[in-house]
């Protein structure tokens, strides 16, 4: 399972990122300007934490459902919301939380979006909102979320993108991409949508994709940037620097890359290897990865100085670690 943590206060939010590596980061902020600043876990200057757990991923139904757990700042559990098969992403935009539930697969028809009041944790939708995916003829399989200008943008695993209105949650725009198995999504500083594609147009399984799609906010056109294989997450740091990571395959380590969106034809530059997940802070970008070739699944955490991309270990403190179990985790 993977988990995401939001520390919610008047102007505070901390995200412990989720990816296939179950990474845990401290003092990390979302790049989206709609999100408040972060707080360290050692500080109690926050009101609630929201923890997203994906549940049991891609096992024969019935699977263990994903959940959103709400804690107070004494880490007392206040509520648990079961959200269905595979909770995949959780963002705050304005006064609301949006949660993407992928569902079991592309034809399972059990994926959708939950909307919650960020202050109270109460549902704002009586049931999960589901959307038709014209590319598959089934209900959409949402993967990741971004937000801007009163809309939430959703990447679909089929290789499509949809925007929804934040007032009534109705579909606004939709575009089928020249790709499949779309994953991470963000809004660039140039007000364009960037989507990582884990599959190319005719791929029948994820992992071989080599493109990032670039779209206007209206989702009525698509261009592509060629990148190393299997891009996963993406974030904008500045007008001329964006970061993304790739998961590669069994023969290649994960890695972090950067590129300049103003010169999309210039090949991305490798920043560091071993980056299964990442998030951007005020001075550093933080990465986390698991070395699956070690018997104890060694956790690798690095920080990248945003001014010059110098990379160093995130911490030598043996008290900071990630523990994994089959059906539960400590973070």
What function would you assign to each model-found segment?
Residues 75-82, 122-136, 170-176, 220-226, ...:
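A short beta-strand motif characteristic of beta-propeller blades
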Residues 162, 167-285, 291-292:
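Acidic, serine/threonine- and glycine-rich low-complexity intrinsically disordered segments
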